[in-house]
Design a protein with these regions (language model features):
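An N-terminal-biased, well-structured beta-alpha scaffold segment characteristic
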Residues: 1-97, 217
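Rossmann-like dinucleotide/phosphate-binding beta-alpha-beta segment
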Residues: 137-226
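Short glycine-/small-residue-rich Rossmann-like dinucleotide-binding loops
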Residues: 54-55, 200, 206-208, 234-235, ...
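Structural alpha-helical scaffold elements that stabilize or flank donor/cofactor-binding regions
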Residues: 42-43, 194-195, 220, 284-285
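Phosphate-binding beta-alpha-beta segment of Rossmann-like dinucleotide-binding domains, i.e.
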Residues: 92-148, 160-163, 167, 175
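Glycine-rich nucleotide-phosphate-binding loops and adjacent flexible coil segments
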Residues: 231
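Rossmann-like dinucleotide-binding domain for NAD(H)/NADP(H)
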Residues: 227, 236-331
Length: 331
């Protein structure tokens, strides 16, 4: 089975090359630095499958071009699949497989790191000390111990975040359509309105769907406690950015930590340090002293990358052998 990898970085080579050389997987890999889109889809000619990341264009026109060059399988080396037109994939005869849970702890740990960095002004403190300024002005934060955390979405990542918050000595509230029995004794499930009104730290861990888009908006922000901490390591579209910026200007939040944000496509994972940034969202958000923005890196640990590689190759092997596809995504 020949797999064409799109949007690859050096670390992809490091973790996938070893597995590709293993006869157990029986795969040949061709790495492309170009990301998957309508222009690059024809480069998959001669392959059986393509492998793409969360920032790839997997819309209907792209999938149609992949099908035209003989691609039968789309391997997502990520958990999210809201960038994939599943109906078009089915119509084109392309099987979609994903990595449902590579290291939930990695993302949850980053979420707590963002919460603390924003709350305790770690970035500002670092810059001050670098400039030999050891004054404490502007660095006042809040205790997490004894406060309440609100976890929106209690899948694997949300559950990991709940356990972290519990370990910090926080009262943990949770909202999800489905209760996670593994969290019995750790969280108390409540309605979203109660969570927003009660929690001192709100962390988003739900998928981006029609129902969850802008789950954080003008109205839900008004429900939140003043000086709450808001963290998003899930999908940028969960937060209405304009509403968030207005709330920050009104000094609503003690801190905001974002690993994702709206309209990050075309910018995420790229280096624009020598360019003029065209996206206005990040500069505005970074102008607030209590906001910390990172580059969609919550997943980015050695443990997670190894797990992603193994599961992706196992998905490819199962497809090639006609075995049960436990990680298939259907429309």
């Amino acid at each position: 089975m020949k797999i064409i990898f799109y949007g690859t970085r050096e670390y992809d080579h490091y973790y996938f090359d070893v597995l590709a050389a293993d006869p157990e997987y029986g795969c040949e890999i061709r790495f492309l630095t170009a990301n998957l889109d309508a222009d690059t889809a024809p480069l998959a000619q001669g392959g059986d499958a393509v492998c793409a990341f969360v920032n790839a264009d997997c819309s209907a026109p792209v999938l149609e071009k992949l099908a035209q060059v003989g691609i039968r399988c789309l391997l997502l080396r990520c958990a999210g699949y809201n960038n994939v037109d599943l109906a078009a994939a089915q119509k084109c005869g392309i099987t979609v497989l994903r990595v449902p849970g590579y290291s939930p702890e990695a993302v949850a740990e980053h979420a707590m790191a963002l919460a603390q960095a924003a709350n305790r002004r770690i970035c500002k403190a670092y810059i001050k000390v670098r400039n030999n300024n050891f004054a404490l002005d502007g660095l006042l934060g809040y205790n997490l111990y004894g406060s309440s955390a609100g976890i929106v979405g209690t899948g694997r990542i949300g559950a990991a975040m709940a356990r972290i918050c519990h370990g910090f000595g926080m009262t943990v509230l949770a909202y999800d359509q489905y209760r996670n029995p593994a969290l019995d004794g750790i969280v108390r499930y409540v309605e979203l309105d109660e969570l927003l009104r009660t929690a001192d730290l709100i962390s988003l861990h739900c998928p981006l769907t029609v129902e969850t888009r802008h789950i954080i908006n003008v109205d839900t922000i008004k429900m939140m406690r003043d000086n709450a901490i808001l963290v998003n390591t899930s999908r940028g579209g969960l937060i209405d950015t304009d509403a968030l910026i207005d709330a920050l200007r009104a000094r609503k939040f003690a801190g905001v930590g974002l690993d994702v944000y709206e309209d990050e496509d075309g910018q995420v994972f790229e280096d624009f340090s020598d360019d003029v940034l065209q996206n206005e969202v990040v500069p505005i958000l970074m102008s607030f002293p209590n906001v910390v923005v990172t580059s969609h890196q919550a997943f980015f640990t050695r443990t997670a990358l190894q797990s992603i590689a193994i599961t992706t190759m196992e998905n490819a092997r199962a497809f090639a052998r006609g075995e049960k596809l436990v990680n298939e995504v259907k429309g």
